[in-house]
UniProtKB/Swiss-Prot annotation:
Region (Disordered): 1-27, 212-386
GATA-type zinc finger locations on the chain: 494-518
Name this polypeptide is given: GATA zinc finger domain-containing protein 4
Positions in coiled-coil regions: none
InterPro entries: Znf_GATA
Amino acid sequence: MSINHFNNNKNNNNKNNKNNEENFWDNTQCNNDRNKFSIDNIINSNYPTANTTTITSTTNQTIQNNVLNSINIKNNESLKNIYYDENLQRKLTSINFLKNLCSVRDQPFNFNEHIKSIQSINSYRKCISNEIFKKNLINNQLSDILIIIEITSFIGDCIFEIFYLNYFQETLEKDILLFSNASETICIPSHHSPSPQFPVYYTENINNATPSTVVSNSPNNYSQPISPQSSQSTTPTIISSNSPLKTRNKNNNNNYNNNNNNNNNNNNNNNNNNNNSNNNNNNNNYFNNNKKNKIGDCNSNNSNNNNNNNHNNNNNNNNYNYNNNNNNNNNNNNNNNNNNNNNNNNNNNNNNNNNNNNNSNNNKNNNNINNNNNNNNNNNNNINNNNNNNSINNIINNNNNFNNNNINNNLFNNNSMNYNKKENYNWESSSSEEDNNNLIKEQSVKKNETVKKQYIPRKSKYVNYERIKKVSLSKSVEPFDTMKRMEKKKPGNCSMCNIKESISWIKTMVNGQLCNACGLKAIRQIKIEN
């Protein structure tokens, strides 16, 4: 689009000039052809400057009032009423100007057109800088304020499009070197440049300005919320509901074990760091003193701990409520733990480690235990958390834990690629022994069921049938549906998966070639090793 525009102007204005092709992109020609997109034209189309004769006293007074009012109002106002709504067309014009410049990005590769595009980019950079230099020479103070607003907003619209052009130019030079011998148009995949960061537009409250989403009219039609982070955003990993890495949290309160992908907070020495989704920077700890896990049943302990060692381990596997208070280094020696128990007693413990029982007993031990029962026994209902995090009783059933070494995040072992022949997997953690027994019964019943046999052709010493079965089951590919027979020929290399000796020449209805490893149809021009 932009190249055609420049070429049309070139042909209309310089028909008899033989050196148009060489001199078209110099500064002189650029200054002659840039009037439509110049900042002069853009600003004058919205606000008359001090040098124009068409300005009226009414318009000048209105502009003065708007500027002075915006300057005098310091809070809860912005400069939006001066330029944003009125100059929306100017913004669109500036974006379209750059859009036309770099529209060649979405076109097939063409050597000559890309060279012209790079030259036009460099020329228009000079044009923009010259216009900005001119506007800085204006002496009228009121016009200076308006022009600064106009130019600043114009640059805000253009500079990140130029960011695209910089990236595009770098990749373009590589393409030119790569396809320098090409004389015709070649279609190549388009380059995906990183999304730029746009400047924050003024909001109604300039003091509470928040990032907004700016939609650009560039060819890529990107839309990105403004953030101070890097322009190259990282895509979060999405784990599907059928993934073996996703375990359903049956306990409560979203307590995850980041080490073993299970819901137990008792198998690691670093439980106080990794087992809870609670933020350690929060000094408000909530304790469940009753057997019901409700918000209304929680009592807040507002003790200030500099070490943030207070963690809530709420595990409801067996309806046990654990209150683990590890106050290692408390600034306050008087830790007032207000427990709404049956005795309703307030105890002032001068020890750094407090044992809060329902009987309100003060035990000088190194363990903080909040027992809902009236016993200090270390039974299955209690957890002893030492200050050194050395001894932790494993109370939750080991059936809730998955061994990551057996799962390996895949159905196959990375070394031997042995297919796990279990027909069904229960990736959810069972919360009781009864669930495990039911699972064993279901699996035993399914093993006795008759399974429909898959058609397998006559055996060949060049075909690894176990590997074919494994891959076809994992990728839901059935490579033998259209097969009639197989010929014994020496295998070659697959062009899809690049695995040596994985191609066996197979005659199908379309006489194609089928890879035994990936189950895909390879390119027909593949060479067979002798």
